[in-house]
Swiss-Prot record:
It holds the Pfam family RRM_1. Residues 11-76 form the J domain. GO terms for biological process: negative regulation of transcription by RNA polymerase II. The gene is Dnajc17. This is DnaJ homolog subfamily C member 17. The modification N6-methyllysine is found at K264. GO terms for cellular component: cytoplasm; nucleus. Residues 150-166 have a biased composition (Basic and acidic residues). It is found in: Cytoplasm; Nucleus.
Amino acid sequence: MAVTKELLQMDLYALLGIEEKAADKEVKKAYRQKALSCHPDKNPDNPRAAELFHQLSQALEVLTDAAARAAYDKVRKAKKQAAERTQRLDENRKKVKLDLEARERQAQAHGSEEEEESRSATTLEQEIARLREEGSRQLEEQQRLIQEQIRQDREQRLRGRTENTEGKGTPKLKLKWKCKKEDESQGGYSRDVLLRLLQKYGEVLNLVLSRKKAGNAIVEFATVRAAELAVRNEVGLADNPLKVSWLEGQPQSTVDPGPPGLSKGSVLSERDFESLVMMRMRQAAERQQLIAQMQQEDEGRPT
């Protein structure tokens, strides 16, 4: 950590958003949360992301080492006390204070506040140098955990896309519940209620409630995994259970392996890419056709 003067100007506790007496566990947790949000890999368009990430790393190194933290707290306390004293003084008293401190510095070779702060700063610099020589295992571990979490997030997004591209279309489920036609509450299942029940399993692309046939709806999920979880677990309201069944996109019990040209880590050819685009366009058209068909059937059904 090369820039000690800049470090002394920073409030490391405020930087991490923690209390001064926070334990090491709280310091590390705050570091992970802050570092994840400003990691350069996740903020390529932010020129200050790398600088802020470096400052957070410095704060972690100092605040998780007992000796370095004690030295930093001493400097911070001295600066805080000096700032509080200065704030209480008006302009005239500030001048008197400065004159008095000048005379005290001339009369005393040791013991002044400036010398105490200087000694504390020197101690802090020595502790930082020691940390740099020994290598901060804690910092390396926290940064490794951040990289691992970023990797897992990236893999999860890729898995969601793969589920959609490998299947015949986005998964759709049929929802049924008891509801009388004249029931304005729709049996307790408004659009907002259904979304709240279903979105916990994954992204919902579409939700269509039948206008003619009460107690019926179709939901379209972004991934097969989300649809599977909804079919397997959702029971709806206790006083009016919800029946969830497959309408389209139910996965096979066994899945055939993909063609060699589309193995993991390979790059799609131009023809493969065009086929994938056409498939997604067909899926969108089929989805709109299904919704229109359901609405048409509802309108044609006698009331």
